[in-house]
Curated annotation (Swiss-Prot):
It catalyses: tRNA(Thr) + L-threonine + ATP = L-threonyl-tRNA(Thr) + AMP + diphosphate + H(+). It comes from Helicobacter pylori (strain HPAG1). The gene is thrS. PANTHER family: THREONINE--TRNA LIGASE, CHLOROPLASTIC_MITOCHONDRIAL 2, THREONINE-TRNA LIGASE. Homodimer. This is Threonine--tRNA ligase. Belongs to the class-II aminoacyl-tRNA synthetase family. It is found in: Cytoplasm.
Length: 612
């Protein structure tokens, strides 16, 4: 079965077997020229077809179990597929096995999946009395609609789909949630069931293993267990509280970045948290980003709480006159920003309403774009290497709606391409995916569970310098407009630390661990030595804790291990008298002894091992 053709890929579109017939091709899909065949396997294109059909299998099963069920949409998403629906019956996660069993029953029935096309009028009549399907049709332009049918079940859909339910053998329903109709909080709440599907048993098994690992590594769970951060309903959703250990971890990353930024010629700056709405109108945020912003009024003047740091940095640039000799100017700020996110999308530290960006803006001449971007790529590589992340780049080019002339866009895009080539970085191209004001490079990192995360970005901006009338004096003593490069490598500290926590499963490397060394005195008489050693380690900028509660030695060691502390030192008579320390080293997965002075030198050198 693995070699069976299920669809083809042509002109960036998947065409299934049924669609080929509807197109009037006498030999079906084989008559299509210039196509890429899609076979039944675990390749990305095949999985899109498989998961879409599995969403319909889910809907068919729900209809059989709950005859009053009505369906909205059931798309393929990054984590599999889902279907939004409503029913008068109460459904919980306990019902998922029953629904899954019904899906398997229909799959074994080997139902042919067929397609027909209807006019809008016919489709409205076919789904008469189904307000959810009418809502779907109201959002679709055009007068032709596809309807796919399997057994007694049919659904409005453009495809693509498998030719038969017999292909669907390896799937799993993963969770149940609520979802507002069309994502609008003002609409009714629907039920959403998520699922996953693969062509092979191995694909499903590997995925389910990853899901279990992800649950163990969930940064929200680790945040509580390790005392890193918390949320408080009295404060508000999406507003994290950094606890001492989490703040230590974050500070270490901030300090390492600051050292590197200063060495790379960046200047620290700081803008206000709130700015008059007048500047947000100049920047375009007021017209294009207002729904994501918070506002307040002071002395009858409207202010916007900043969702981005760029305007503040522009004002820093405008605080003095500049010549070509000053450029490039590199400003950085750990800028706190606020963005209005709907409550349904908030997710631990990954999606919050207040966060801090490792933000920088570079003001340079057009000719300096390539060298500046090249330096950022070098910086990015060192950071990702330090945290053991693999990563990929995506270059986004000019969209249909944009400002500036073709020549400027082409030069800016080529400068980014040349910088990527200079560093021998393979990259994908997202045609038309750039911002309206310039091309960009997105940095996507891959964690230990092979999940990809969008973090940093490098954006060339030719819009804001024009809006704010920025200028520098060039070599000919004429005013020239600088280019502005927006640059964030981590993205935000909140998001990066969430990803970092899950990547390492809380076992942070020594150089950023919130507690690097645990000292465990066996008895009260060893406590003085532990405190002296603690002071020596603190002088070397080591985060150290003395576990001196009145517990058994084994319990204290287990506590330190549970807290995922990289080094544990047990201090007894022998250690105090000889100053030869007993060390449990998580990284080396070993226990060994070392003289005190040698140990202090070792941890000092470990702190110097990592730099960006």
């Amino acid at each position: 079965m693995s070699a069976e053709l299920i669809a083809v890929y042509k002109d960036e579109q998947i065409i299934d077997l049924e669609s080929a017939k509807v197109l009037g091709l006498s030999d079906g899909i084989k008559a299509l020229n210039g196509t890429e065949p899609i076979y039944f396997d675990d390749s990305p294109l095949a999985l899109e077809v498989i998961r879409h059909s599995c969403a319909h299998l889910l809907a068919q099963s729900l209809k059989a179990l709950y005859p009053d069920a009505k369906f909205f949409v059931g798309p393929v998403v990054e984590e599999g597929f889902y279907y939004d629906f409503k029913t008068a019956s109460k459904i919980s996660e306990e019902d998922l096995p029953k629904i899954e069993a019904k899906m398997k029953e229909f799959a074994k029935s080997k139902l042919a999946i067929t397609k027909e096309t209807l006019t809008r009028e016919q489709a409205l009549e076919r789904f008469k009395g189904d307000e959810l399907k009418h809502a779907v049709m109201s959002k679709i332009s055009g007068d032709i609609f596809g309807v796919y049918k399997q057994g007694e079940f049919e659904d409005l859909c453009k495809g693509p789909h498998l030719p038969n339910t017999r292909f669907l053998n390896h799937f799993k329903l993963t969770k149940l949630a609520g979802a507002y109709l069309g994502g609008d909080e003002n609409n009714e709440m629907l039920i959403r069931i998520y699922g996953i599907a693969f062509a092979t048993k191995e694909g499903l098994k590997d995925y389910l293993f990853q899901i279990e690992e992800a649950k163990k590594r969930d940064h929200r769970k680790l945040g509580v267990e390790l005392g890193l951060f918390s949320f408080d309903d009295e404060i508000g959703a999406g507003l994290p509280l950094w606890l001492p250990k989490g703040a230590r971890l974050r500070k270490r990353i901030e300090d390492l970045l600051s050292q590197a930024l200063l060495l790379r010629g960046y200047e620290p700056v700081k803008g206000p948290e709130i700015l008059k709405s007048d500047v947000w109108k100049i920047s375009g945020h007021y017209d294009n980003y207002k729904e994501n912003m918070y506002f307040t009024t002071i002395d009858e003047q409207e202010y916007g709480i900043k969702p981005m740091n760029c305007v503040g940095h522009i004002k820093v640039y405008q605080s003095a006159l500049h010549s070509y000799r000053d450029l490039p100017l590199r400003f950085y700020e750990y800028g706190v920003v606020h963005r209005h996110e709907k409550s349904g999308v908030l997710h631990g530290l990954l999606r919050v309403r207040e966060f801090t960006q490792d933000d920088a803006h570079i003001f340079c001449s057009f000719e300096q774009i390539q060298s500046e971007v090249s330096a950022i790529l070098d910086f990015t590589h060192k950071i990702m290497q330090a945290f053991d992340f693999s990563y990929e780049m995506e270059l986004s080019t000019r969209p249909a709606k944009s400002i500036g002339d073709d020549e400027v866009w082409e030069k800016a895009t080529n400068a980014l391409k040349e910088a990527l080539k200079e560093h021998r970085i393979d990259y994908k191209i997202d045609e038309g995916g750039g911002a309206f004001y310039g091309p960009k490079i997105d940095i996507k990192i891959t964690d230990a569970l092979r999940r990809k995360w969008q973090c940093g970005t490098i954006q060339v901006d030719m819009n804001l310098p024009e809006r704010f009338k920025l200028a520098f004096t060039n070599e000919r003593n004429h005013a020239e407009q600088p280019v502005m490069i927006h640059r964030a490598i981590l993205g935000s500290f909140e998001r990066f630390i969430a990803i970092l926590s899950e990547h390492f499963g809380g076992n942070f490397p020594f150089f950023v661990a919130p507690t690097q060394i645990a000292l465990i005195p066996i008895n009260e008489e060893h406590h003085v030595f532990a405190l002296k050693l603690k002071e020596e380690l603190k002088k070397r900028d080591i985060f150290v804790e003395v576990l001196d509660k009145n517990d058994s030695l084994n319990k204290k060691v287990r506590l330190a291990e549970k807290q995922k502390i990289p080094m544990i030192l047990v201090l007894g008579n022998e250690e105090v008298e000889t100053e030869i320390l007993s060390i449990r080293d998580r990284e080396k997965q070993a226990q060994y002894k070392m003289p005190l002075k040698e140990f202090l030198n070792m941890v000092e050198s470990k702190m110097q091992e990592v730099s960006f």
